[in-house]
Amino acid sequence: MKHFFIAIILGISFNLFSQSGSNTWQILAKITYKKEYDELMGFKIDKPVFSDPIKKLEGKEITVKGYIIPVEGYKSHSEFIFSAFPYNMCFFCGGAGPETVMEVETIDPVKYQAEAIVLKGTLELNSEDINRLMFKLTNAKKVK
């Protein structure tokens, strides 16, 4: 009986851990924007203002669940765009905001699949380079 309860507790713990990847997007959604003049562009742009919960994740290893956004010629890459939502609902299709996507650099190439996957890596924040996404996951590995 004791082993049964230990197995249940371990199962619940594993389930909570595996769900934590989807909670990461909820934290990353806590972002605001400020209008700031950009010299290069010659007009005001929206610059992200990261909340304290997001700032606490910077440089930390996080787990995130999401979808690979396919690009032409994609088979297996070490650099790709990752989304909280499937392709038909993602930021690039007009269905979500820029806080729902991130750039990813993996240690090993990840083969494309339409189903959600889980990645683990180090989160980098970007509020300066308007040619890049706000979030970047580096040294990432596919864990599920």
Label every model-predicted segment.
Residues Q19-K144:
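OB-fold and OB-like single-stranded nucleic-acid-recognition modules
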Residues M1-F4, S18-S20:
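Absolute protein N-terminus
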Residues H3-F14:
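Sec-dependent N-terminal signal peptides
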